[in-house]
UniProtKB/Swiss-Prot annotation:
The gene is eutR. Keywords: Activator, DNA-binding, Transcription, Transcription regulation. Pathway: Amine and polyamine degradation; ethanolamine degradation. GO terms for biological process: ethanolamine catabolic process; regulation of DNA-templated transcription. This is HTH-type DNA-binding transcriptional activator EutR. GO terms for molecular function: cis-regulatory region sequence-specific DNA binding; DNA-binding transcription factor activity. Coiled coil: none annotated. Signal peptide: none annotated. The lineage of its organism: Bacteria, Pseudomonadati, Pseudomonadota, Gammaproteobacteria, Enterobacterales. It comes from the Bacteria. The keyword Phosphoprotein does not apply. Activates the transcription of the eut operon. Also positively regulates its own transcription. Probably binds ethanolamine and vitamin B12 as effectors. Competes with ethanolamine ammonia-lysase (EAL, the first enzyme in the EA degradation pathway) for adenosylcobalamin. It comes from Escherichia coli (strain K12). Residues 243-344 form the HTH araC/xylS-type domain. Pfam families: HTH_18. InterPro entries: AraC_XylS_family_regulators, Homeodomain-like_sf, HTH_AraC, HTH_AraC-typ_CS.
Amino acid sequence: MKKTRTANLHHLYHEPLPENLKLTPKVEVDNVHQRQTTDVYEHALTITAWQQIYDQLHPGKFHGEFTEILLDDIQVFREYTGLALRQSCLVWPNSFWFGIPATRGEQGFIGSQCLGSAEIATRPGGTEFELSTPDDYTILGVVLSEDVITRQANFLHNPDRVLHMLRNQSALEVKEQHKAALWGFVQQALATFCENPENLHQPAVRKVLGDNLLMAMGAMLEEAQPMVTAESISHQSYRRLLSRAREYVLENMSEPVTVLDLCNQLHVSRRTLQNAFHAILGIGPNAWLKRIRLNAVRRELISPWSQSMTVKDAAMQWGFWHLGQFATDYQQLFSEKPSLTLHQRMREWG
């Protein structure tokens, strides 16, 4: 069936929402989800009631795994991504998200703040944020509606302090034993209810699970502190510079953005730009620009909402005028020919 709806594939939706629209996940029959994904665009669509846009930064065939359970005004999930990503995220309104990364392996970032073994990420719903994650990365997510926190404020000793922190901080330092306890609880809950999802249809089961989760969250948040970053000021500013660079590229899709354009727009020298990209990503700005544009073309080729009907249309839209070189670069990054990406979309959606 052909889709006629138009959508912006490269930006999140920021229009004011109707007052009566509630995006809190609905707990009905379908409240346990498990998915295996082979594409970052597909993976970005897996989390219920979120908006996300992912860019694949490292070459290879992507593999992702996602598991979630939905309670009454509570969402719990585990996300695994096999390749390094840059993520734009927007959680459902009137909620708070908590990201609990695995303690093993390379560290991820929320904005310019590093998420180490004693840190968690947090953002209010309806507020866009950016994550940078390395290869082979696992993170647990807990989303609590503001209604739940208000109704169950007794699980917090000092709710005003905690809520102020959640509204104004993107990363918190927590006790490692509390983080480990929450990690174990969430993992056990996901494993149990993925094996027996019908048990979550019982209101009593959902209530006990939700209350136990709130107690574990409360123990962690009561002793949490705003994160004091150990990363240098220069590295933090470099990360902010990269975020601004990406937004500029995607806001100016009518013409290919060059390194000179970035220098002029961001008011930095070519050397500063080079230093920022090499310090944070290990590649130069030219290579990065190409990867961001290749990801944009892939979204145009793979999305059922895309208006691009040929590889040439999508490539030219993002400034790839040498189609042979474009096809080579595309296959090197995604381990797939662009014609195959488009063919799969046309076969499925017409």
